[in-house]
């Protein structure tokens, strides 16, 4: 790293010592490189080198820790190459294996393992996985509520009546579990519960006035009133500047004074504030004669401003002061018993859960942090953070504690860091690096306030608490940088965003992009904003066009089509010019590839599926890493329905799903016949009746008998088989695993079924057993823990457009970023829950009056609601910042609005209130990313299209370097990839003519067709598709005289790409075929630039496992040495040589071709010579070397005789050679088998 040219600020972050140091590192500023270089400098200091194991480096994820170790190892190795005799470097490389570079959970686990005796813990404890943890919580919460019902405690019963639905108490159970998860992110969960309950033990208005809730309410009211004052002041200013508006002046000024008076009373008592707000009145405006005003747009604007202020002040009074202060106090007092019950229930749940875990000798991830705290704190009873002897040893041992991604820390982690470091001493040693603008994990209880407090209090100058700012961005083009700065200077503030985005925080250009060499090439360019207008406004002459396009295309589809159009434009311009991006390896511009493009979404649910469809229809290769959709996939729903029927067949919904599925395959008519037997009975009862009584056709009776016998067989097996074995048995017995493999996306569907099997295996290893418990667990997982996401079957180097959530994109970068769905409203649904909770403000319930069954919000709930809303919007602001800063060269924003004209009017009304920024109050009222972006762009010179729509001039524009291109699309004018077939009209005419005399001919035609006998009956025995592998197997069998008829279910089960997981016990391992498929998959995905050493290959295999491309058994079955041997062989070296020279290596190439049916069965008559069979297969590898095409097929078989081995696969390689010729037009010159068993290449 010595060759790196560091900036002054980076160098300061690397070399500054003897203080607590906070490094505020903006997106793309080289944060990780700086952290690694700091560590290298510390451990290689010539005067005072510090051993690497005396540093504690805390990372956010295990993957980040592994990457950090790898970077440090590479840096040390590089230095060793320069000075190979350095004993210190050799020592550090050795110590790296035991260094403390880890997540906070890993550190806590180590502390617990070494000090288990201090907390009365059995040293043989294990960490329970998520599955077992969820099941235990479900069991304990049910037991807790059952016991409470048995106690017949009236306070508990009232609590249940008040906050449960009329159907069940599930919502309350979820509330207790949710509150438990929330408070466990704090260091003292029980103390928090106790304090939250005591907050409601107030008796007087004075106590209420002094509460933190009122303080928050006043803060919120102040922000709102300040916004209204600014709005009215702007209106008065416009009145003064516009001829003819003088009659408005007195009324506006009077109303402004009343609002100012209320603002001045905000800090007074609750009663005084209530009264001053109710004094604000709006009288009727004086009339102004027509045609006397110089600018009617201004007149309309000031009236709109006044109307808005009037409505908002009314809403403020009704929303905040839902009653008089006396009545609000009364509601708090009456809510106290409910809050007391909730906190007691949650506290008891903690005790029971801990007791159950102790009984089973297990810990969960929350325990790791809290037990670690218990070990590190001397006296835990008073909840005082007094370091224990063990904590003091850590303080003495660690020379420096370095925390990566500090903006995502929580209070527990902060306490642990303080206890093991010298942070609060005269000799501080904590290094913290992160970017608070990228703190987007509030839902995991991250506390960006920890970073912000230090950022605001630490000094830029010398001292024991210092900060350094890294705001030079080495990622993005100037167009992107300027756009990011313009938007966030306009909209980010301490109110919304929790940080003022000033010139200090702004990104500075650090990346160097060369000028283009070809004048026709397109590089960079303005940030694009595409606004889809969803309104029904249309020109009169559009009526016919509207009727022609009367298809119900959703708004998401239309937005997707805008994206499709822009992708196609970027990939291939109609005028021949091409969009270019900089190749980071060559430093030259190259054509944009699909893999350079990402589509980012705030949430992928309901969006990714549509985008996949629309891009797929347009021929654009695309992949969505959704993190959802797993439980909604047809294959998982079908298997879950099957399991539910086996558990309890008296369930019509899963039974119907099973009956229409391919497993049973009843038709709609058959289902109707079953239903009509007795509409009052369950389907299962009617099936029993049909099978025992001859009520319907013999065929349906036989089917019903089959259904009953199958269910009975499955139910008997479910009793004694472990759930994972049972599920795999069902896959095989029903042939469903093979069936889904033959469906579109079959590889993905089978991989999804494998995941369910693996989940069942995890479940079977817990203390919970049985089909019922597994179904209950999956149901709970679906509802409370979110979707698992479909299986991953795509590597990072595939040339496809990627769709992902903004959260998943954090830390990544892409040449072209589409930020889609920006018109979607923020999700504020949680604010409507009956009881809210907040770390600082405690609990906020609704007050439920059981006598008249009414509910009303309380002052604590309103205070928490207002704070949570601002915090949620601040989080959304930071999420938007993360999305913007993923783009390297091009940023394209899309979003839909209900009515463009009304939206733009709203944006302009917000934008005109201040000449520099959008007022925080206006930002807080924004409902989407597009609202924020639109407000800012209304003030930009490139926002002319927005201002023009409402007739506004450019006087409100700001000077700015950023460049924007704004387009507004009307939903009825969007003409992309949906043109009607040119021949459709002609076809309709022909059909209508045919319809006129169809009745005359239909009878005789029906009889003719029913009596028809097919001339080529023998060909019906032929399969329409066959794989090369099957063809090879048939050719090997000399005794087959006629074509063997293969079972379709057996054929469906064959899939070369998917490893079939066996339910056999672990000691039996995976089969040879599975091992072979695993090696093939590894050879498909492996990066040829990192295969020089055994370590590099191991790291790549480990990455495939960590990213869930291969399972544990598959990972363990692959011998990395065998792969290294291939790359050390002559053939492997030749392949790498081609790759290193920029040649193309074609891997895992599927093909389809046709062969004569006589090649399959020579006994067929000659008339079948023209009957074609579709031959399909997958070519492992081929490449061009020295003007020769070389074909390679990997084999993992046991080889006894090499000649027989060659003969066995000779025909297969001939078919592959023919396929390569058809694809490339070039003959294969050399065909090789590579035997991993022999570690040898064999020329065929």
From Swiss-Prot:
GO CC, alphabetical: cytosol; DNA helicase complex
Protein family according to the UniProt entry: Belongs to the helicase family. AddA subfamily.
Entries under SUPFAM superfamilies matching the protein: P-loop containing nucleoside triphosphate hydrolases, Restriction endonuclease-like
Pfam families assigned to the protein according to its UniProt record, in alphabetical order: PDDEXK_1, UvrD-helicase, UvrD_C
Annotated organism of origin: Clostridium botulinum (strain Alaska E43 / Type E3)
Disulfide bonds: none
MF-aspect GO terms: 3'-5' DNA helicase activity; 3'-5' exonuclease activity; ATP binding; ATP hydrolysis activity; double-stranded DNA binding
Superkingdom: Bacteria
Domain UvrD-like helicase C-terminal: from-to ranges: 517-811
Positions contributing to ATP binding: 25-32
Self-association and partners: Heterodimer of AddA and AddB/RexB.
Cofactor(s) named in the record: Mg(2+)
Protein name: ATP-dependent helicase/nuclease subunit A
Function: The heterodimer acts as both an ATP-dependent DNA helicase and an ATP-dependent, dual-direction single-stranded exonuclease. Recognizes the chi site generating a DNA molecule suitable for the initiation of homologous recombination. The AddA nuclease domain is required for chi fragment generation; this subunit has the helicase and 3' -> 5' nuclease activities.
Transmembrane regions listed in the UniProt entry: none
Boundaries of every UvrD-like helicase ATP-binding domain copy: 4-477
GO biological process terms on file: double-strand break repair via homologous recombination
């Amino acid at each position: 790293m010595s060759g790196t040219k560091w900036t002054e600020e980076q160098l300061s972050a690397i070399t500054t010592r003897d203080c607590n140091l906070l490094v505020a590192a903006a997106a793309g500023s080289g944060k990780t490189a700086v952290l690694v270089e700091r560590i290298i400098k510390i451990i290689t200091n010539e005067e005072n080198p510090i051993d690497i194991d005396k540093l504690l480096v805390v990372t956010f994820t295990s993957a980040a820790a592994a990457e950090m170790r790898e970077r440090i190892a590479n840096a040390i190795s590089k230095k060793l190459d320069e000075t190979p005799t350095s004993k210190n470097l050799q020592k550090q490389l050795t110590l790296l294996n035991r260094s403390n570079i880890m997540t906070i959970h890993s550190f806590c686990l180590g502390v617990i393992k070494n000090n288990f005796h201090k907390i009365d813990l059995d040293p043989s404890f294990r960490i329970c996985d998520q599955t077992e943890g969820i099941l235990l919580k479900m069991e304990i919460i049910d037991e807790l509520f059952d016991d409470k019902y048995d106690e017949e405690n009236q306070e508990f019963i009232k609590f249940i009546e008040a906050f449960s639905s009329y159907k069940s108490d599930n919502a309350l159970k979820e509330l207790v579990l949710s509150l438990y998860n929330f408070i466990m992110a704090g260091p003292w969960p029980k103390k928090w519960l106790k304090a939250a309950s005591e907050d409601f033990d107030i008796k007087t208005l004075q106590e209420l006035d002094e509460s933190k809730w009122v303080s928050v309410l006043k803060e919120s009211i102040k922000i709102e009133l300040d916004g209204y004052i600014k709005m009215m002041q702007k209106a008065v200013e416009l009145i003064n500047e516009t001829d003819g508006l003088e009659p408005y002046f007195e009324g506006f000024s009077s109303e402004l004074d009343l609002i100012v008076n209320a603002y001045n009373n905000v800090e007074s008592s609750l009663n005084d504030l209530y009264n001053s707000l109710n004094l604000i009145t709006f009288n009727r405006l004086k009339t102004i004669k027509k045609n006397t005003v110089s600018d009617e747009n201004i007149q309309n604007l000031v009236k709109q401003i006044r109307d808005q202020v009037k409505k908002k002040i009314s809403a403020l009074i009704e929303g905040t002061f839902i009653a008089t202060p006396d009545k609000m106090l009364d509601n708090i007092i009456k809510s106290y018993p409910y809050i007391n019950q909730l906190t007691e229930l949650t506290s008891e749940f903690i005790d029971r859960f801990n007791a159950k875990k102790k009984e089973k000798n297990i810990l969960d991830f929350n325990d790791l942090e809290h037990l670690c705290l218990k070990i590190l704190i001397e006296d835990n009873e008073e909840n005082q953070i007094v370091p224990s002897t063990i904590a003091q040893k850590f303080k003495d041992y660690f020379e420096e504690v370095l925390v990566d991604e500090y903006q995502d820390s929580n209070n527990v982690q902060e306490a642990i860091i303080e206890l093991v470091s010298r942070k609060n001493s005269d000799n501080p040693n904590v290094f913290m690096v992160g970017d608070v603008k990228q703190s987007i994990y509030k839902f995991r209880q991250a506390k960006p306030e920890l970073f912000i407090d230090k950022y605001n209090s630490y000094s830029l100058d010398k001292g024991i608490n210092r900060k350094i700012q890294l705001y030079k961005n080495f990622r993005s083009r100037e167009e992107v940088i300027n756009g990011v700065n313009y938007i966030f200077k306009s909209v980010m503030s301490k109110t919304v965003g929790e940080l003022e985005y000033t010139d200090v925080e702004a990104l500075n250009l650090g990346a160097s992009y060369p000028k283009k060499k070809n004048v026709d090439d397109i590089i960079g360019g303005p940030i694009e904003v595409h606004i889809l207008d969803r309104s029904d406004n249309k020109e009169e002459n559009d009526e016919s066009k509207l009727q022609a396009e009367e298809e119900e295309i959703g708004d998401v589809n239309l937005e997707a089509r805008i994206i499709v159009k822009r992708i196609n434009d970027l990939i291939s311009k109609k005028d021949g010019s091409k969009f270019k991006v900089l190749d980071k390896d060559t430093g030259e511009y190259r054509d944009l590839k699909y893999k350079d493009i990402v589509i980012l979404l705030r949430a992928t649910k309901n969006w990714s599926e549509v985008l996949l469809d629309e891009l797929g229809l347009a021929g654009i290769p695309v992949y969505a890493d959704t993190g959802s959709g797993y439980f909604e996939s047809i294959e998982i729903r079908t298997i879950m329905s099957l399991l539910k029927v086996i558990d309890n067949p008296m369930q019509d919904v899963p039974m119907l799903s099973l009956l229409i599925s391919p497993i049973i395959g009843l038709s709609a008519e058959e289902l109707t016949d079953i239903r009509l037997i007795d509409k009052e009975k369950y389907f299962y009862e009617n099936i029993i009746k049909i099978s025992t009584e001859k009520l319907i056709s013999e065929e349906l009776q036989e089917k019903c008998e089959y259904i009953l016998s199958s269910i009975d067989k499955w139910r008997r097996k479910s009793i004694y088989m472990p759930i994972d074995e049972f599920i795999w048995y069902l896959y095989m017995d029903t042939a469903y695993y093979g069936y889904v493999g033959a469906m579109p996306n079959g590889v993905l569907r089978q991989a999804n079924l494998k995941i369910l099997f693996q989940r069942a295996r995890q479940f079977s290893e817990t203390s919970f057993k049985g089909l019922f418990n597994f179904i209950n667990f999956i149901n709970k997982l679906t509802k409370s823990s979110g979707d698992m996401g479909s299986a991953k079957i795509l590597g990072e180097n595939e040339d496809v457009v990627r769709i992902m959530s903004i959260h998943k994109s954090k830390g990544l970068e892409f040449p072209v970023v589409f930020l889609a769905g920006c018109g979607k409203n923020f999700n504020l649904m949680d604010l409507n829950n009956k009881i809210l909770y907040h770390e600082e403000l405690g609990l906020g319930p609704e007050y439920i009056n059981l006598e008249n069954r009414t509910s009303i919000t309380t002052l604590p709930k309103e205070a928490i609601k207002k704070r949570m809303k601002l915090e949620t919007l601040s989080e959304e602001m930071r999420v938007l910042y993360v999305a913007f800063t993923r783009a390297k060269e091009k940023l394209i924003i899309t979003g839909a609005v209900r009515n463009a004209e009304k939206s733009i009017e709203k944006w302009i009304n917000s934008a005109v209130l201040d000449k520099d920024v959008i007022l925080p109050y206006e930002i807080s009222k924004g409902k989407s990313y597009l609202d924020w972006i639109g407000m800012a762009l209304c003030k930009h010179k490139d926002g002319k299209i927005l201002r023009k729509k409402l007739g506004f001039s450019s006087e409100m524009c700001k000077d700015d370097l950023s460049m924007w291109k704004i387009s507004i699309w009307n939903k009825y004018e969007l003409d992309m990839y949906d043109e009607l077939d040119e021949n459709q009209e002609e076809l309709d005419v022909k059909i209508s003519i045919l319809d006129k005399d169809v009745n005359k001919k239909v009878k005789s035609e029906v009889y003719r067709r029913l009596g028809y006998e097919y001339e080529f009956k023998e060909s019906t025995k032929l399969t329409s598709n066959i794989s090369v592998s099957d063809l090879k197997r048939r050719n090997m069998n000399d005794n087959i005289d006629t074509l063997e008829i293969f079972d379709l279910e057996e054929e469906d089960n064959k899939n070369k790409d998917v490893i079939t997981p066996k339910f056999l016990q672990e000691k039996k391992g995976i089969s040879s075929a599975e091992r072979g498929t695993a090696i093939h998959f590894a050879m498909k995905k492996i990066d040829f630039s990192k295969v020089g050493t055994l370590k590099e290959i191991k790291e790549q295999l480990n990455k495939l496992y960590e990213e869930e491309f291969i399972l544990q058994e598959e990972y363990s079955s692959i011998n990395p040495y065998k792969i290294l041997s291939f790359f050390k062989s002559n053939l492997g070296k030749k392949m790498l040589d081609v790759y290193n020279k920029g040649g193309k290596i074609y891997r895992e190439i599927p093909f389809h071709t046709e062969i004569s049916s006589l090649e399959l069965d020579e006994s067929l008559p000659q008339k079948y010579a023209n009957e074609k069979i579709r031959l399909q297969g997958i070519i492992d590898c081929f490449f061009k070397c020295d003007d020769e095409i070389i074909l390679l097929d990997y084999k993992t078989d046991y080889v006894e005789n090499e000649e027989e081995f060659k003969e066995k696969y000779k025909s297969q390689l001939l078919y592959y050679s023919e396929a390569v010729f058809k694809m490339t037009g070039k003959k294969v010159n050399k065909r090789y088998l590579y035997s991993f068993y022999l570690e040898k290449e064999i020329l065929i």
